[in-house]
Amino acid sequence: MDNEKGLLIVLSGPSGVGKGTVRKEIFDDPTTSYKYSVSMTTRNMREGEVDGVDYFFKTKEEFEALIQEDQFIEYAEYVGNYYGTPVQYVKDTMAAGHDVFLEIEVEGAKQVRKKFPDALFIFLAPPSLDHLKERLVGRGTESDEKIQSRVNEARKEVEMMNLYDYVVVNDEVHLAKERIQSIVEAEHLKRERVEAIYRKMLLEAKK
């Protein structure tokens, strides 16, 4: 089974739903074998974040230059900031047989779906929009106006749930993590993926 190509795992959901917290919980687990593809952004670094670990932080000018060079799988402008996924790392890592984990915005996930239709798309949903607003207020990093803008955007994003393969409600971080890991494990056992590997093995055996 060494010939299996890596799976592209795409986790997205509304701002404030806890994508980063769930992703950290997954990668703090020593049994996790996924490779994390660090996204790039022009937003300000938050307290506790590390450049090159949580995001690659760039200026708007630097980001736009990379767009012109076609260096992104996807990118989107969200609440005045750019977010994007550098392309080469993802392709190389999957080709080497490793699963690649993306934590991106909903608009970006739509672009990835077009380029990687076989990827695994997971929507991380809040228990409710009120709960989401409480999380955003609790951050203490944005104005009331910006928080309301994010909540309004979240309403639209929840309506786009049908673009995803699975929905995981982030009611408890450790439960969300376990649900995502179970989904990925099941995806590797899908008949289409396993059948393709065995067909390749049978062809090689005939040589």
Curated annotation (Swiss-Prot):
Residues 6-185 form the Guanylate kinase-like domain. The keyword Transit peptide does not apply. The gene is gmk. It catalyses: GMP + ATP = GDP + ADP. Essential for recycling GMP and indirectly, cGMP. Belongs to the guanylate kinase family. It comes from the Bacteria. It holds the Pfam family Guanylate_kin. This is Guanylate kinase. One of its GO terms (cellular component) is cytosol. GO terms for molecular function: ATP binding; guanylate kinase activity. Its EC number is 2.7.4.8. InterPro entries: GK/Ca_channel_bsu (IPR008145), Guanylate_kin-like_dom (IPR008144), Guanylate_kinase (IPR017665), Guanylate_kinase_CS (IPR020590), P-loop_NTPase (IPR027417). Keywords: ATP-binding, Cytoplasm, Kinase, Nucleotide-binding, Transferase. It is an enzyme of class 2 (transferase). PROSITE patterns: GUANYLATE_KINASE_1, GUANYLATE_KINASE_2. Disulfide bonds: none annotated. ATP binds at G13, P14, S15, G16, V17, G18, K19, G20.
